[in-house]
Amino acid sequence: MNYIKAGKWLTVFLTFLGILLFIDLFPKEEHDQKTKSKQKPDYRAAYHFTTPDKWKNDPQKPIYFDGKYHYFYLYNRDYPKGNGTEWRHAVSEDLVHWTDEGVAIPKYTNPDGDIWTGSVVVDKENTAGFGKNALVAIVTQPSAKDKKQEQYLWYSTDKGKSFKFYSGNPVMPNPGTDDFRDPKVIWDDQDNKWVMVMAEGSKIGFYESDNLKDWHYTSGFFPEQAGMVECPDLYMMRASDGTNKWVLGASANGKPWGKPNTYAYWTGSFDGKEFKADQTEAQWLDYGFDWYGGVTFEDSKSTDPLEKRYALAWMNNWDYANNTPTMKNGFNGTDSVIRELRLKEQDGTYSLVSQPIEALEQLTVSTDEIEDQDVNGSKTLSITGDTYQLDTDLSWSELKNAGVRLRESEDQKRHIDVGIFAEGGYAYVNRAATNQPDKSNTYVESKAPYDVNKRKVHLKILVDKTTIEVFVGDGKTVFSNEVFPKPEDKGITLYSDGGTASFKNITVKHFDSIHE
């Protein structure tokens, strides 16, 4: 009897204790759900470079110095309420992970306005007189007197941590034109001198100097169907057939002629004073809406620096630069992934081809390999994600349209489409069915010609929280676009219209974040 009574009392006690625990846990669970629902969505890209806060736009050409890549970019600490840019500094050993070094050239420290785009070089032979291996930057600033665009020299003797204003500024006064900016400086090994290209409205000016201080005009290049040019670029590359070619590039506006508003380039010859293009019509490094202010730079670790180069750009567009939910996370400014460039010869034409740098592969945390799929209609994959690289070989016999829907919602109403419109003869990226920055809906489908008679294509697609970059085939055609899907939209669907499409070698590499 005593044992039975004790057992009953124990049962009652445990039941009462369980009720108390349930009452205590239920409100906590409800509170956790409410707290979770109030958390801000994370719109910071996982593996793309982003400004720590506020605003960034134009990249400056990175340099390799003292075992690291040094990257400067335009930064506005007062955004969105105040104007004016300055140069912020970051360093990297692998071009994937970056360490912020803070502001290197602050704005408004002299009467000549804020700091705009320019370029920085390592003065290995002390041609400017600031010391061997001094970093010398030439940047555009609006003059104190009449706000005209002029070129000013700053120099650093502490490995780019800070820069001093040269007392002899400006080194290039305005010659009497409205547009006179974005100087890009390179060393010409053939003639042992510095060469500069300058954006001058619809013209690219060429200049030379022995000491980075005294500059002389040598010639001008007038692009066709490129509109106003900015951020010019000049470099030599060795093509796939062994030919050395000079490449002249610039951010350009081809929209009035149905062309991109990204990075235009011309291959040709350069004699140290004048550039002559192989053909007058520009080629384009990117067909998306958001690859602007692009810069290229040397692979300084390579034994053959002419074989390949690197490139990156600001992923935004001046037509809608401030339309971004990333401000919920306190910033507006994302770069493209760094890509590897090679110069390919085909049928007598030389073209740049791009692929993401291999160093991105180190971010892979898991890989999904999906069996080959024949699709007539649509097929949703079981895997999901918002930070990954997807590769597939797409082929067909007869069809109108085929591709991949990315960042798809559960009800399949929201998505981004990447594919080949065989009936129209072009590749495309369409962001109309997801959140995206262009509120006018003018820039929703980016497209580029594609030879559909091949009846096959390899697609390499980089997906991040706010970006999508598509490398078509060998990478001669690339699309870079901003997108702002809801964080929960992570589906992937294969589709075809008007016939059967075959998707083979489907691989999805899920990437880790570069942020701590």
UniProtKB/Swiss-Prot annotation:
GO terms for cellular component: cytoplasm; plasma membrane. Residues 1-5 are cytoplasmic. Pfam families: Glyco_hydro_32C, Glyco_hydro_32N. GO terms for molecular function: 2,6-beta-fructan 6-levanbiohydrolase activity; sucrose alpha-glucosidase activity. Keywords: Carbohydrate metabolism, Cell membrane, Glycosidase, Hydrolase, Membrane, Transmembrane, Transmembrane helix. InterPro entries: ConA-like_dom_sf, Glyco_hydro_32, Glyco_hydro_32_C, Glyco_hydro_32_N, Glyco_hydro_beta-prop_sf. It is an enzyme of class 3 (hydrolase). Its EC number is 3.2.1.64. It is found in: Cell membrane. It is a single-pass membrane protein. Residues 27-516 are extracellular. Catalyzes the degradation of levan mainly into levanbiose (difructose). Is not active on sucrose. This is Levanbiose-producing levanase. The gene is levB.
